[in-house]
Regions:
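Amphipathic coiled-coil/heptad-repeat helices and related helical stalk/stem segments
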Residues: 3, 18, 147-151
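Short, Asp-centered acidic motifs that coordinate Mg2+ and/or phosphate
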Residues: 2, 31, 104
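Short amphipathic alpha-helix adjacent to the substrate-entry channel of hydrolases
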Residues: 16-35
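Serine-hydrolase catalytic-loop signature spanning alpha/beta hydrolases and amidase-signature enzymes
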Residues: 8-12, 32
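Glycine/threonine-rich flexible loop motifs
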Residues: 11-17, 42
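Short beta-strand element of the alpha/beta-hydrolase
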Residues: 1-9
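Active-site-proximal cap/loop segments of hydrolase catalytic domains
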Residues: 35-233
């Protein structure tokens, strides 16, 4: 089994680095992979430009292609996908597109109600985001483009894999109700009986709860979920 991580936004490069925590997955036979998808800048500025605004769907297509490659090349069997914030948008959009590819998924503080958030100019962080996603208030094409991939707006009556969604009550970047709305809609429409968890940390912001050991606790919780979904606990 494999844990596939992705982000693909704001031109941020996901540079591989050593992680002590991931050893707990690798020691249990899991593979860890990072997808360098468009929207990031791992392959230069054009790689970023080809994954934003009207080309945003390239980000999700690349992530699906990465998962298919891992399976076709026999590197992976079952796959768990993970992303947070704008990477949570990636997870939500990917699950709407190709839920059958994945055993489970983790979406941390996910930006999943994209259209409603970007339409609300009263939110302090919304106007700066128009450069990345488009301005649906002034541009009809931006409105239709965002609506076509926004995870909340595209939940379907179909089977979804086992899913863990997290949120922080005091998160100033991605409001906690985005995750709650998305989970509620998934519970209403999904046709499977797979577990769907919403974990809202009542003392956390966008980066989790402050404190020396709290991040370790959160990673342990997530890894326990992932391992359990692959029957590795």
């Amino acid at each position: 089994p494999t844990l596939l991580y992705g982000y693909g936004a704001y031109g941020m490069s996901m540079t591989p680095s050593f992680s002590v925590a991931r050893l707990s997955l690798v020691d249990r036979g899991m593979v860890f992979a990072i997808a360098h998808i468009r929207g990031g800048m791992e392959k230069g500025r054009q790689w970023y430009l080809d994954g934003k605004l009207k080309k945003k769907k390239n980000t999700f297509k690349d992530f699906v292609s990465s998962a298919k490659f891992l399976k076709q090349s026999k590197i992976s069997g079952d796959i768990t996908i993970h992303g947070g914030s704008a990477g949570g948008l990636l997870i939500g959009a990917t699950l709407n597109m190709a839920p059958q590819l994945f055993k489970s998924a983790v979406a941390d503080v996910p930006f999943v109600d994209v259209l409603n958030t970007i339409l609300d100019a009263s939110l302090p962080l919304t106007p700066p985001e128009w450069e990345e996603w488009g301005n649906p208030i002034l541009n009809k094409n931006d409105f239709l483009n965002i609506k076509s991939y926004s995870p909340y707006d595209n939940v379907k009556k179909q089977a979804y894999p086992t899913l863990l969604v997290t949120a922080g009550l005091t998160d100033p970047r991605v409001t906690y109700w985005e995750a709650a709305k998305w989970v509620a809609k998934l519970r209403e429409l999904k046709t499977d009986k797979n577990n769907l968890y919403l974990k809202t940390n009542m003392e956390a912001g966008h980066a989790g709860k402050a404190g020396r050991y709290h991040q370790i606790d959160e990673v342990a919780f997530m890894y326990a979920f992932i391992l359990d979904s692959h029957d590795l606990l």
